[in-house]
Amino acid sequence: MSFKVEDLGKNMVKLTIEATAEDFDKAIEQAYQKNKGKMNVQGFRKGKAPRAIIEKMYGVGVFYEDAANFIIPEAYEQAIEESKLDVVARPEIDVVQVEKGQPFIFTAEVAVKPEVTLGAYKGVEVSKSEIEVTEDEIMAELDKVREQNSRTITVEDRAVMDKDIVTIDFEGFVDGVAFEGGKGEDYALTIGSHSFIDTFEDQLVGKNIGEDVEVNVTFPTEYHAADLAGKPALFKVKVKEIKAKELPAADDEFAGDVSEFNTLEEYKADLKKSLTEKKDKAAKTAKEDAVVDKVIENATMEIPDAMVDTQKRQMAEDFAQRLKMQGLSLEQYFQFTGLNPNTFMENLGPQALKRIQSRLVLEAVVKAENITVSVEEIDKELAEMASAYQMEVDKLKELIGEKEKEQIVMDMAVQKAIDLVASEAKEV
């Protein structure tokens, strides 16, 4: 195997990789062994026909695709290792030459890790945050706890109000025709949850049990179902039941029930303390973000589009995994929000770019400041990770490969870089 590297600019390179004719023939043989049992050749039992007979019958290129799938990954990885390129995105593969008895040639266009030229990263100026917890914020937090301890009661003597849980039957029509997925029975809808599109929920406020309501809405222009996007719709809705949350009184008895305190004032003081700690933590994070933004602004780097695309895909996969843990699929999320996959991915772009820029400048600070992580610090981090995963440290170490360990160490070094630039920043 041989290769050459061509710099395409903007941190993109093109590898032209050539596998020998002998290696390509070995890959064809692998493909033959994989597929021969699936091929019918007159005069031979399945799996017994010689390769030459199959190639004559089906064409000399019958095994080329599978052979390429065998040879490309191995040759690509070898070229990356030997070239010592720091690849940061999936390669774009293009087969240049595939011919029996000849070398197999393909190209791989890849994004490589950008070089960062740091500007000022110590003593950057950021706005100072003032930490204050108001009485209104304390009462809002208290109301959250009251709502968590509320009970649901059936309401029969009034119309629908905001925050009610309304049981409805509904059917949707576009241009007078019912559409797929637009019908539901005994659906429990919380008014104000924005679970349904447009002003659907608002139009139920003031309606009574047993009332038939015509709700007029317009689907979002970016709605996931293209045949409905941007179209007006009529929903025929029947209000079947109204339920409301009944909150407990905010008094000493309530404070004693939900906390270790005997009086409401003591409990409110504890809520204030918790809110202050939360605001302190948020202010620390906001300061770190602001400082990193300044460091990015002062630095010079060129991010290839392929690197951003890879980050977007990773973020989408992470988001889908979080949804799955909540019992939802990405498709259901699109349905609820009216987004489509293309818009969703586009929306991830700025955040993906910011993550990449942040990581690159912080790794550059790690290098510039010669930041290191001790063995003791690594062991402590692994112990905390093992505890979080509820496994033995030795078992975790077995599961973590060398690359994963290097990533953990770099993550720790990056956090030290954040602490450094934040501590050196000037609050004005």
Curated annotation (Swiss-Prot):
PPIase FKBP-type domain mapped to chain residues: 163-248
GO BP, sorted A to Z: 'de novo' cotranslational protein folding; cell division; chaperone-mediated protein folding; protein transport; protein unfolding
Domain of life from the UniProt record: Bacteria
Coiled-coil blocks: none
Record's catalysed reaction(s): [protein]-peptidylproline (omega=180) = [protein]-peptidylproline (omega=0)
Keyword line: Cell cycle, Cell division, Chaperone, Cytoplasm, Isomerase, Rotamase
Main location group: cytoplasm
Keyword check for Chaperone: yes
GO cellular component: cytoplasm
Role, per record: Involved in protein export. Acts as a chaperone by maintaining the newly synthesized protein in an open conformation. Functions as a peptidyl-prolyl cis-trans isomerase.
PANTHER family referenced in this protein's UniProt entry, alphabetically: TRIGGER FACTOR CHAPERONE AND PEPTIDYL-PROLYL CIS/TRANS ISOMERASE, TRIGGER FACTOR-LIKE PROTEIN TIG, CHLOROPLASTIC
Protein name according to UniProt: Trigger factor
Organism name: Lachnoclostridium phytofermentans (strain ATCC 700394 / DSM 18823 / ISDg) (Clostridium phytofermentans)
